[in-house]
Amino acid sequence: MVLGLCACGGNNAATATTAATEAPVTEASAETEAPAETEAPATEASAAVTSADDIADEMTSSDGKYEIAFVTDVGQLKDKSFNQGTFDGVKLYAANAGKSYKYYQPAGGDQATDDDRYDAMKLAVENGAKVVVCAGFMQGNALDKAAKEFTDTRFVFIDGWAMGLNNVAGIAFQEEQCGYLAGYAAVMDGYTKLGFTGGGGGANAACNRYGYGFVQGADAAAAVKGVKVDINYSWLYGASFQASNELQTMAAGWYQNGTEVIFACGGSMFQSVAAAASAEDASVIGVDVDQSFESDTVITSA
């Protein structure tokens, strides 16, 4: 078989890491606050909350403190992808454990600096956080500084590592495996003209791993079926992980030139690709969470 690749920018491969050690929920058994702090929703065992959509985006204790904090990655909180999926997990745990919680978005938005991220973590601690969940590998420098300063606070680094600090738990993923399965499934389902558009401008290790796995999975399926597969891939328009007219135009162009399905790998970028797919009667592969609820163009999510 022959696998054709058409590149539109991007570089910097990264090696996948294994999932980190202890989960952040170990803080729950050590609480000594007054009972008033347990007045978060769903404290009754028989009324467990199972949908994050049923929970408010923040819940405070009677003294105005928040025990669990979530510091967002770049992009929107409600990105229907990485940020939202992570925060939904935080909310579900907190609500069912009777803990107060709050989210923090670093100042600067898509242009947030390490100082902006540190300031968000510092504010979370000042507001009473005992556990701070930080999403995205870009949090590394700020988290290292905050964890060394606030040694009594536990930090959870999603898409990161423990950095040799006792109060940091790293949680990493093998994105290449999800990407591989998505590429393999797409080709086995009959798609032979694929696209991949990744967030982070080629510097995001997680998106890189998704992309490499996607190509390898498509290659393996093509060998099984004895078919030729062509793949367009691009890191353009995805540096901020945001939806954009430019990305939608690029995706529409790919579809018009024969691409059948595009793996939209990067937060709100999905919205642009899905809009193009809908207009061109084409297909999309989602990422991070099940995005089939967002568009009937989605054939699977990785």
Locate the predicted segments by residue:
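C-terminal motif of bacterial Sec signal peptides marking the signal peptidase cleavage site
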Residues: 3-7
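A residue-level marker of the well-folded mature domains of exported/periplasmic proteins
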Residues: 12, 18-302
